[in-house]
C-alpha cells in the first residue's frame, strides 16, 4: 500500500465534495427557514448546486466500490489485507449515509412545502418592491411570476428525469456491448470446436485405415514366418536322412 494508491486520490476528492455539499446544505436550510435573507434565484442556484454535488459524490463512491471489488478479486496482486479493505468499505458506507440523509431532507414533503412557500414569499417580495400602476396589473404580474416558478420547477424535474434516462441508456449500451462481446466469443469458440471435431473425425478415419493396413501386414508376416518354419523342418529331415544313410553304409562296409 503506497501513497500513489488511486483510492486515496479519489477519497480526498470525495471528502472535499462532501464538505462543499454540507456547506451548501446548511445554506439551503437557512434560506428555507428565513424567507427574508435571499431571493428565489439564490434558492434555485443553491438547490441545483447541492443536487449536482450530491450526484457527483454518488458517482465517485460507485467508482470506489469498483476499485474495492477489483482488489477483492485479486488480493495478492494489490497486497491489501482485510483490515484495510474494511476501513475503505466503512468510509464508503458512512459517506453514502451522509449523502442519503441530505437527499432525504431535500425530498422530504415538509421541506418541499417550505421551499415552495419560500419561492412564493420571494416572488411577493420582488413584486412588492416594484411599482405597478393598478391592482389588476399587479396580481396578473404576480400570477405570471408564479406560473414561471412552477414552469421552472417542472423543467428541473424533467431535466432530472432526462438525466436518469441518459444514465439508463448508457448502462444499457454497456450491457449491450458486453452481450455482443460474449456473443462473438461464443461464436468463435463454437467455430473452433467444429474445426476440432472435423480434425478428430479425420484423425479417426486415418487411424482406422492405418490399423487395417497394420493387420494386413501382420497377417503377411505370419504367413511368411509359417512358410519359413516349414522349410526348416524339411531341411532338418533331409539332413538327418542323409546322415542315417551314411551311417548304414559305413556299418555295412565295416
Curated annotation (Swiss-Prot):
Q: Which UniProt keywords apply?
A: Coiled coil, Endosome, Golgi apparatus, Membrane, Protein transport, Transmembrane, Transmembrane helix, Transport
Residue ranges of region Disordered? 103-138
- Where in or outside the cell? Golgi apparatus membrane; Golgi apparatus, trans-Golgi network membrane; Recycling endosome membrane
Q: Which residues form a coiled coil?
A: 46-72
Q: Which residues cross the membrane?
A: 234-254
Q: Which domain of life is it from?
A: Eukaryota
- The entry's protein name is Syntaxin-6
In which organism is this protein found?
Answer: Gallus gallus
According to the entry, what is the taxonomic lineage of the organism? Eukaryota, Metazoa, Chordata, Craniata, Vertebrata
Amino acid at each position: 500500500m503506497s501513497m500513489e494508491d488511486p483510492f486515496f486520490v479519489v477519497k480526498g476528492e470525495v471528502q472535499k465534495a462532501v464538505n462543499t455539499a454540507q456547506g451548501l446544505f446548511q445554506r439551503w436550510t437557512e434560506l428555507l427557514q428565513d424567507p427574508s435573507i435571499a431571493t428565489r434565484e439564490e434558492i434555485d442556484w443553491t438547490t441545483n448546486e447541492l443536487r449536482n454535488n450530491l450526484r457527483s459524490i454518488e458517482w465517485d463512491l460507485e467508482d470506489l466500490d469498483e476499485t474495492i471489488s477489483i482488489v477483492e478479486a485479486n488480493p495478492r496482486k494489490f497486497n491489501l489485507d482485510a483490515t484495510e479493505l474494511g476501513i475503505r468499505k466503512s468510509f464508503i458506507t458512512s459517506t453514502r449515509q451522509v449523502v442519503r440523509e441530505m437527499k432525504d431532507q431535500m425530498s422530504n414533503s415538509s421541506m418541499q412545502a417550505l421551499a415552495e412557500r419560500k419561492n412564493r414569499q420571494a416572488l411577493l417580495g420582488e413584486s412588492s418592491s416594484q411599482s405597478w400602476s393598478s391592482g389588476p396589473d399587479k396580481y396578473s404580474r404576480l400570477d405570471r411570476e408564479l406560473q414561471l416558478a412552477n414552469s421552472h420547477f417542472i423543467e428541473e424535474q424533467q431535466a432530472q428525469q432526462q438525466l436518469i434516462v441518459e444514465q439508463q441508456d448508457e448502462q444499457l449500451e454497456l450491457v449491450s456491448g458486453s452481450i455482443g462481446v460474449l456473443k462473438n466469443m461464443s461464436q468463435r469458440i463454437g467455430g473452433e470446436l467444429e474445426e476440432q471435431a472435423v480434425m478428430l473425425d479425420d484423425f479417426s478415419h486415418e487411424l482406422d485405415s492405418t490399423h487395417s493396413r497394420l493387420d494386413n501386414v501382420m497377417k503377411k508376416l505370419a504367413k511368411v514366418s509359417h512358410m519359413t518354419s516349414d522349410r526348416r523342418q524339411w531341411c532338418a529331415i533331409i539332413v538327418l536322412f542323409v546322415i542315417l544313410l551314411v551311417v548304414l553304409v559305413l556299418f555295412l562296409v565295416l
